């Protein structure tokens, strides 16, 4: 009976628990024994392995977060630590590892692969910044959370004829901001892909209020500028009350939406199948409505395609 380990790494994403449930169910089907690794790659180094049973996953498909935990472990970049992790896996008799996480996690997976450990990566990050998949686990739940929050801000902004500047997660990828902006009808969408022109933002907000609009919504990807400073500058330049809101980590939490549960289950089932057939060293993804697989090196060297269709659309729909 093959022994498979599974870990969650990086920032948590809604749907990770659905992936863990699928790993256990699929392991039963393929006659494999599944072990959970607590706290990501740190847990491998510390030998923190725990058998995952039916009961462990019987009520987690609808839960946010990850029952295995996830911690930042920068020490794993050191070759000596990677070697120790591989030795722990070999000593425990692990035949393959399932890594649920984002791009940084997949670099860790590649390190294990280079030490002879069969590894499969399953993309899970609300940032949706993994180039080898159209959508990562957690993205659509975070998107719904962002849109629901923006809808509420629109209500109060409209009541007071106010501008709201909303910071959305995503790091260097603007997908979450782009889709949240489209779905919420935001007047201005600012992402790493669009760039940031402060004067243009102020001018467009000013034009919106001159047309007697009751509100203006500006959504912007984190780390591009201080939303508090931008809100102050908009208010000073336009004389319209402006408020800044940072959605923050609320975007990572909550019960995963149906689509995240589905792709988590599909990708994890495929991942366990691959390891059961001694076929590792892959990163999985979703293309269209299919699960696809890439060699680790190929996946890590891919570039994230620009959402050209969507960006062209919002350019045409500017007020």
Identify the residue ranges that each predicted region occupies:
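Glycine-rich oxoanion-binding loops at beta->alpha junctions
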Residues: 44-97, 105, 137-144, 148, ...
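Short Gly/Thr/Asp-enriched flexible loops that form oxyanion-binding sites at enzyme active sites
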Residues: 18-23, 103-117, 177
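Short beta-strand elements at the ligand-binding edges of bilobed clamshell
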Residues: 132-143, 255-261
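C-terminal non-catalytic interaction/assembly regions of soluble proteins
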Residues: 226, 233-319
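Accessory alpha-helical/coil subdomains and C-terminal extensions
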Residues: 99-101, 111, 139-241, 245
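Short, acidic/small-residue loops that bind anionic groups at enzyme active sites
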Residues: 34-35, 113-136, 190-194, 246
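N-terminal phosphate-binding or glycine-rich loops at protein starts, especially the Walker A/P-loop
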Residues: 1-45
């Amino acid at each position: 009976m093959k022994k498979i380990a599974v870990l969650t790494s990086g920032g948590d994403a809604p749907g990770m628990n659905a992936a863990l449930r699928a790993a256990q169910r699929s392991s039963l089907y393929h006659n494999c024994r599944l072990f959970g690794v607590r706290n990501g790659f740190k847990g491998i180094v510390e030998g923190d392995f725990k058998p995952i049973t039916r009961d462990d996953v019987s009520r987690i498909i609808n839960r946010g977060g990850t029952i295995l935990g996830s911690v930042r472990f920068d020490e794993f970049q050191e070759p000596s630590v990677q070697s120790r992790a591989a030795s722990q896996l070999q000593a425990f008799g692990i035949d393959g590892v399932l890594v649920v996480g984002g791009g940084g996690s997949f670099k860790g997976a590649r390190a294990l692969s280079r030490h002879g450990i069969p590894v499969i990566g399953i993309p899970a990050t609300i940032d949706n910044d993994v180039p080898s998949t159209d959508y990562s686990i957690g993205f659509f739940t975070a998107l719904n959370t962002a849109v629901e929050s923006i809808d509420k801000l629109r209500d109060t902004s409209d009541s007071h004829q106010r501008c709201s500047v909303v910071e959305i997660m995503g790091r260097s990828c603007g997908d979450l901001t782009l889709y949240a902006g489209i779905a919420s009808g935001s007047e201005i969408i600012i992402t790493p892909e669009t760039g940031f022109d402060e004067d243009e933002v102020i001018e467009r907000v000013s034009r919106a209020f001159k047309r007697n609009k009751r509100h203006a919504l500006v959504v912007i990807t984190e780390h591009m500028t201080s939303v508090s400073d931008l809100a102050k500058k908009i208010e000073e330049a336009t004389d319209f009350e402006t408020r800044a809101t940072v959605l923050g980590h609320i975007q990572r939490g909550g019960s995963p939406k149906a689509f995240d549960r589905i792709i988590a289950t599909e990708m994890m089932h495929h991942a366990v199948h691959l390891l059961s057939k001694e076929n590792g060293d892959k990163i999985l993804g979703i293309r269209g409505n299919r699960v696809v697989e890439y060699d680790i090196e190929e996946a890590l060297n891919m570039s994230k395609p620009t959402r050209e269709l969507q960006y062209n659309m919002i350019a045409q729909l500017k007020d």
